[in-house]
Amino acid sequence: MRECISIHIGQAGIQVGNACWELYCLEHGIQPDGQMPGDKTVGGGDDAFNTFFSETGAGKHVPRAVFVDLEPTVIDEVRTGAYRQLFHPEQLISGKEDAANNFARGHYTIGKEIVDLCLDRIRKLSDNCTGLQGFLVFNAVGGGTGSGLGSLLLERLSVDYGKKSKLGFTVYPSPQVSTSVVEPYNSVLSTHSLLEHTDVSILLDNEAIYDICRRSLDIERPTYTNLNRLVSQVISSLTASLRFDGALNVDVNEFQTNLVPYPRIHFMLSSYAPVISAEKAYHEQLSVAEITNSAFEPSSMMAKCDPRHGKYMACCLMYRGDVVPKDVNAAVATIKTKRTIQFVDWCPTGFKCGINYQPPGVVPGGDLAKVQRAVCMISNSTSVVEVFSRIDHKFDLMYAKRAFVHWYVGEGMEEGEFSEAREDLAALEKDYEEVGAEFDDGEDGDEGDEY
């Protein structure tokens, strides 16, 4: 089997994780207590969904997941929620005091007390796998736990499981909406380690997802639950080919191979279509061509940046439901003729497609309509750099005055780490610039030494 272990860190990671596991259970017909009436082979490990669930002798299905937070309130919601019987109590790890939005607390003082316990639990999960293929890491980089403990865990995973791929689902700070003043610091410090220790990072941003909920689902005041259910559809589409059988299956390592041209350029945009409410879906015929087009709409992107300002390097389309390869090829051919969707000149083909026959599931009482087919797009576009330059700008404004820095230094960080991380991000912005540049400038000479 090719198992995946999910690691959910901090409030964002845990709440997105809740939405994901709820959706996985619905898609596989697993009840909240872990029983699966449709599964005839008790304890048999060869079903496709066993990549994400392990089976006990009693026929209970347990998620291969760890939830970690430095304070108990968010994890207590899992411990008392509808799916409390699904998770093994050892998989829910919570500390006593939180990271207080401080990267240094999550990474150095408080985080290092809990990280060995987490690694121990992850080790137990991985011993339970026959062929672990990688980790899915869910966190946000604006807070303290997601950024600090998240980076610490990723660094330790690189040491313990060097060759295994790590896929990150990372919530980045939004341009207008902010949950804490020191978001720019935490984001820059933690992106510094994401650059080194994740193989593919999929950027999400609350504001972009708010706008999608408002525009496409007519929810006037979206809550985190609305956002997370939308995010979980994307993640479910990505992992569908690991959990079900399909025509063109895609492995976690395949994302990496097809989307990452250079090791540092691994921050992806994602979009999902159709995002449509039940009353509208009734009146629309959502053909493959239509959903493919809307996946490329700038307004469908789940991070606030405009792909028309950059060029695509590669793009991965994961279809699910009633889709045949012929329609996909036709839709992709149409996309290629569009002038607004530009690819870099050194990557002429640029599309990887996957098809999965399992139609998208929906949470009962959720906002999304039940549809016959859906597509999720993960793309590597140079426009992602907008996300970083925005954060860098805010970082510079604060750091010029050394505002709030004493909180970090007081927890055992050195000021040098700020400038080191900031330089790394400046280099990343430069990398994106060079990748998007045309080849005729003869720039490729100096890139040869770098990689």
Curated annotation (Swiss-Prot):
Mg(2+) binds at E71. It is an enzyme of class 3 (hydrolase). InterPro entries: Alpha_tubulin, Tub_FtsZ_C, Tubulin, Tubulin/FtsZ-like_C, Tubulin/FtsZ_2-layer-sand-dom, Tubulin/FtsZ_GTPase_sf, Tubulin_C, Tubulin_CS. It catalyses: GTP + H2O = GDP + phosphate + H(+). GO terms for biological process: microtubule-based process. Its cofactor is Mg(2+). GTP binds at Q11, E71, G144, T145, T179, N206, N228. The modification N6-acetyllysine is found at K40. It comes from the Eukaryota. The record marks Y451 as: Involved in polymerization. GO terms for cellular component: cytoplasm; microtubule. Its EC number is 3.6.5.-. GO terms for molecular function: GTP binding; hydrolase activity; metal ion binding; structural constituent of cytoskeleton. Gene3D superfamilies: Helix hairpin bin (1.10.287.600), Tubulin/FtsZ, C-terminal domain (3.30.1330.20), Tubulin/FtsZ, GTPase domain (3.40.50.1440). Signal peptide: none annotated. The active site is at E254. Keywords: Acetylation, Cytoplasm, Cytoskeleton, GTP-binding, Hydrolase, Magnesium, Metal-binding, Microtubule, Nucleotide-binding. Undergoes a tyrosination/detyrosination cycle, the cyclic removal and re-addition of a C-terminal tyrosine residue by the enzymes tubulin tyrosine carboxypeptidase (TTCP) and tubulin tyrosine ligase (TTL), respectively. It is found in: Cytoplasm, Cytoskeleton. Dimer of alpha and beta chains. A typical microtubule is a hollow water-filled tube with an outer diameter of 25 nm and an inner diameter of 15 nM. Alpha-beta heterodimers associate head-to-tail to form protofilaments running lengthwise along the microtubule wall with the beta-tubulin subunit facing the microtubule plus end conferring a structural polarity. Microtubules usually have 13 protofilaments but different protofilament numbers can be found in some organisms and specialized cells. Tubulin is the major constituent of microtubules, a cylinder consisting of laterally associated linear protofilaments composed of alpha- and beta-tubulin heterodimers. Microtubules grow by the addition of GTP-tubulin dimers to the microtubule end, where a stabilizing cap forms. Below the cap, tubulin dimers are in GDP-bound state, owing to GTPase activity of alpha-tubulin. This is Tubulin alpha-2 chain. The lineage of its organism: Eukaryota, Viridiplantae, Streptophyta, Embryophyta, Tracheophyta. The gene is TUBA2.
